[in-house]
Each structure stands twice: as C-alpha cells, then as structure tokens.
Amino acid sequence: RSVDATPNQIRVEAGSRDYYRVSASGVVGSGIALSAQTSQYGGYQDASGYDQQKATLRIDQEWGGWQVDGALEGSQLDQETAGYIRGYEAYEDDQARKENPNPEAYRNAWSGRGHIGLTRDWGDSSELTIRPFWRSNSMTFLQHYLPWQATETNRHHSLGVQMSARGTQNALSWLVGIDADHTEGGLVENQADFFSPNQPDGIHYDYDVDADTVAAFTHLDWSLTDRWQIGAGVRLEDTRYDYANNASDGAVCAPTASACRFYRPADRKDSFSDWTGNLSINHHTDATTVYGQVARGFRAPQTTELYRLQAGQMAADIDSEEAESVEFGIRGAGNTLSYDLSVYWTTKENVIFQDRDRFNVSGAETTHRGVELAASWRISPTWALSGNASYARHRYNSDIQLLGSRDSIDGNDIDTAPKHFGSLQLTADFARYNVPISGELEWVWLS
C-alpha cells in the first residue's frame, strides 16, 4: 500500500475465542506512513492461541530525479500451538476437537525486512529500477508431533539487490533484469531428554549454510493487433550452497544403536543451475479476454533436504524439481458481473521425497489437472456476491518407494491434495447512506 493510500485510522476488532486486534495507520510526514497492529487469539483448542505484533514504515518520495519507494517491516509471534487430536473420526466429536494432547507445544518467531526502490527515466520511453533489500528471521519451536520432542531453531539473514530496465518501442514492451542474493542461515535441533538409543538426547543437527543466488531474466510483450498479444519470457538462475557442519560428522547415536535416526553429513558445497520460461497468447474483445499459456518452472532443493539426513544417508544426491504446465482460460467483465474461468494441466519431474529407507531422493513424477472459477456479481450498490471454486486431480505418475507405502502408487491420488475447495462471500457496504458500516458473510469448503 502506497503512502497516499494509507488511511489515517484506528481500528478495533473482536471475535469469538478471545480474539482481539487493534491496528492504527496514518501519514506521519511528507511521503512517510506508519502502520502497526497487535492481536491475540485464545485458540479453539485448550491451551492454544497466539500474541502477534506487526509494524511497517513506508516512504514514497523524490530525490534528485529518482522516484524512491521503500518499506521497513517487522513482526513478532508468540504462539501456543496444539497437537493433533486422536481417534477414528475424532474431528466429528465437538468435545474432542477442543482437546489439546500437547499443551506444552509452542512456536516463537520474529522477522524483519526492508527494501528501497530507486526508479528514474532512461531515454525517451524506458526506465531503470534498482532495489536493494534485506531480510532476517528466526524461529524456535517444539517438535511436539514427534515422540522425542526435540526443539528446533532455524534462522537466516539475507542481503540482495534487484536491478531491471523496462521500456516500450512501438508495439513491443520489454523487460530485462538481474537479481542477486546472499543468505547466511543455520539450523540447530536439540533434544532435552533421552528417548531411545536411536533417538538420543543432545544435539541432533547444528549447521550453517551460506547461499548465493544470481539470476538474469527478460520478458517481451508484443501487440500483434489491437486484439492479439503475445508474451514470452525466460529466466536463468544459479544457486550455490556452502554447508558447514558445526558438530561431529556421521551418525548421532552410539555405535550400538540398531537404527540411528539422525545423520550429519560432512562439510560440502552444492550448486544448481536452472531456467524457467513462459509463452502466452491473448485475444481481447470489448468485454472478454481469451488466453493460453505454456510455462516451465523449477525448485532448487531446500537445505534441509540436502543436509538434514536420516537413517545413515551420508549424502543426498538430488536435483531441482521441474514443472511444465499448460493453461487456457477466459475472463470477462461487465457492469455488474466479472469472471475468470481457466483449465490447466501440469506435470512435475524430479520430485523430491523420502523413500522407504528415509533417504531424501528425487525422481518422482506427478500430474495435476483442474479447472478454476472466480466470479463476482454486484447485486446492487450496497450488496455484492463473489466466490471462487476449484476442482483438481493430483496423482502420482511413477512407481516410487514412498515412505509409508508398500505397493505401487503409480496412478494413485496424492492424499494431501484436496480435490474440491472454494469460498462464497456476501458483502454489504452502507457508505452510500453515509453510514460507515460494512459486513461480510463467508462460506468456505474443502474436500
């Protein structure tokens, strides 16, 4: 939200289960805005809930021919988390839903980030933008979902810069840029009490990782006619990890342990080079747009997938996940009705997973097909109805030895991916009657 769009207001909210939130915002100087909020929630389970604070300082100014916009943000979270309820169809029991098997569970986290963008004209129809940024966060929580209940602390601190130039020449719009990011992170997992020879007390993991990422990208939009438009883009990215183990290498357990759960790999370096791309075509009329797009994406392995190993795995030989997708759709807008309907098909390759030996490996394939709809209807100047819905099938497309499976899962649905979900909102705004009251009734479903 820009400085000009920041309202001068104080807002107080209250809800069920001891939910309260107080927020304030306003312009505090020329091109400077400040907003802050504090909230608390009692939770619907016993001994659960959170306290959270957030603050944002934003600037929008002009300095020496440069248009400057930036923000400094911070947040703090103290949460009493809750364990999973137990029992067959326990979620249907009103009393069981409120129980908390792990009242000792908690999560404490803080984060901060800042960025400042410098933009100026470059030539007759181009502009240059330089945006340095900083981010920092840390989180400590109890792994209450595991019987041995270790405590984990993870953190990372980053500095980077995004540089881009964009312009327009006749029917062609173009964008080129470079991103660079240096991150220093780490993780410590410590177990206070002895559980078994295979899950001993003490330090399980203690490591630092320096990550450097450099990327170059470009994107073009070409208006063939007033109604036809083609877009294309590509991004090349290189990520390098420098991992340092701060504890002893190898298994955490004593040599007599039958199946040690934790393994600390030796210091190592890893690198991943990947590319993404997209090609789209759009046809516009006065009221509708028909569009199609093909795209390729990737995800480099996470540091925990590479260095937080188990069951004697000495090294994780994994590569980046890849995804290819095709999408077609139609969107339109009229005086009272707007909609966006799309269908998509996606395949993912080199999917990273834990096999039956608890090794982190890659090579799985999945397919994802679905249809999505978003629509809104302005019933009257006061009342509006909006909603979205999705139907999708997510399936394994390879015969992998997934952790917890015994037989072939090729063709099986991915049980953690819902088939149907959506929401419906009925809103009312009485501002036209000079009454500063608005309300919303929402229905959400997931299956």
Each model region followed by its residue ranges:
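Transmembrane beta-barrel wall of Gram-negative outer-membrane proteins
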Residues: 16-40, 45-82, 104-127, 168, ...
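Repeated loop/turn-to-beta-strand initiation elements of outer-membrane beta-barrel proteins
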Residues: 30-34, 65-68, 125-128, 171-174, ...
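Flexible loop and strand-edge segments within Gram-negative outer membrane beta-barrel domains
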Residues: 41, 48, 67-115, 137-156, ...
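Membrane-embedded beta-barrel scaffold of Gram-negative outer-membrane proteins
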Residues: 23-30, 127-143, 282-297, 307, ...
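Gram-negative outer-membrane beta-barrel transporters
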Residues: 223-230, 238, 338, 343-348, ...
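Solvent-exposed loop segments that connect transmembrane elements
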Residues: 82-100, 142-149, 190-204, 241-270, ...
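Transmembrane beta-strands of outer-membrane beta-barrel pores
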Residues: 14-18, 38-42, 63, 74-78, ...
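Structural signature of Gram-negative outer-membrane beta-barrels, strongest in the C-terminal barrel
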Residues: 170-181, 207-346, 378-380, 427
